[in-house]
Regions:
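N-terminal non-catalytic cap/leader segment that marks the start of a structured domain
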Residues: 2-85, 89
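A short glycine-rich, His/Asp/Glu-containing loop-to-beta-strand
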Residues: 28-68, 163-206
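Acidic/His-leaning functional-site neighborhoods
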Residues: 39, 43, 176-247, 251-255
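Short, glycine-/Ser/Thr-/acidic-enriched flexible segments
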Residues: 52-53, 88, 215, 226, ...
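A short beta-strand-loop-beta hairpin characteristic of the jelly-roll/cupin
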Residues: 74-102, 211-236
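Acidic, low-complexity central loop/insert segments
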Residues: 86, 90-126, 132-135
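Conserved metal-binding segment of the jelly-roll/cupin
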Residues: 101-121, 233-254, 259-263
Length: 270
């Protein structure tokens, strides 16, 4: 498991491009039959990627759960949101119950699920499971939310190059969680700016992952304090960590889709 420590805004001003990318950028999440995990000390969030091809992959494969979390199993004191962004469908099994995820479907697993595994329906077209996990203090209910069931909020306009639809999956309007919130924002063709106006939220960090970005295209992800902005060039299926003091916005050379994940104190937000 890759460990990322939190940085502060005063030090961040002096970072080189390489230091900034090492601190915030997450790449290479999808390796065949492996579980890739990045632990951030910003709100203790864990970002994971899994592309099962020929095997059924356990959530703790390659992870020393006791050494990293001080628990006996991954979700003993954690909750997790799972999206399928792969070419094919896949199945998540949690304590013996199977959940089938098509493209862009989401699964919320609450604290206390002991055995969690991932598999693809077709090895020629594997699922890609993108996940974010946050600490949890109590248990709610596991829930599968399809893309059709997500709460939808159209925003922006063609004139401002940010016409988009926010799909709220793991959100107070859809289900209860301890602190995790996740959703998916899809930009329409001809639009390339997301999250405008850019902003910060003092009580929540945020993680973005960009996908549906055509080959050869990139996203310039904006970060830093509002008066000291920087950018990180990102490619398809990269993810990026945003501390609470950092803006998080981006512009692409094409339209794209991104998944946002937040953890923190408050749950009420637009």
């Amino acid at each position: 498991m890759d460990i990322r420590y939190s940085c502060n805004q005063k030090d961040f001003k002096r970072y080189t491009t390489e230091e900034m990318r090492d601190e915030m950028l997450i790449t290479g999440l999808y390796k065949a039959d492996e579980m890739v995990a990045v632990y951030s000390h910003v709100d203790r969030m864990v970002t994971l990627g899994c592309m099962p091809v020929h095997e059924e992959v356990s959530i703790d494969k390659g992870i020393d759960v006791w050494a990293n979390f001080g628990t006996h199993y991954f979700l003993e004191r954690r909750e997790i949101g799972i999206f399928n962004i792969g070419d094919g469908a896949g199945t998540v099994t949690a304590d013996g119950k199977e959940y089938h995820l098509n493209y862009k479907d989401c699964l919320y697993l609450t604290k206390g699920n002991q055995k969690v595994t991932f598999k693809s329906d077709d090895p020629e077209h594997p699922a890609k499971f993108y996940m974010v996990s946050a600490p949890a203090h109590c248990s709610y209910e596991n829930k599968l939310i399809t893309i059709e069931q997500a709460a939808k909020r159209p925003l922006g306009s063609v004139e401002t190059c940010n016409k988009r639809t926010i799909n709220q999956f793991i959100h107070p309007s859809v289900l209860k969680t301890c602190q995790l919130s996740m959703g998916m924002t899809a930009l329409e063709p001809g639009s390339n700016w997301n999250t405008m106006p850019s902003h910060t939220h003092e009580r929540r960090m945020e993680i973005y992952t960009y996908f549906e970005l055509p080959e050869g295209q990139v996203v310039f992800h904006m970060c830093g304090e509002p008066t000291q902005t920087r950018h990180i060039v990102m490619h398809n299926e990269d993810a990026v960590i945003s501390p609470s003091w950092s803006i998080h916005s981006g512009v692409g050379t094409s339209n794209y889709t991104f998944i946002w994940a937040m953890g923190g104190e408050n749950m009420e937000f637009d």
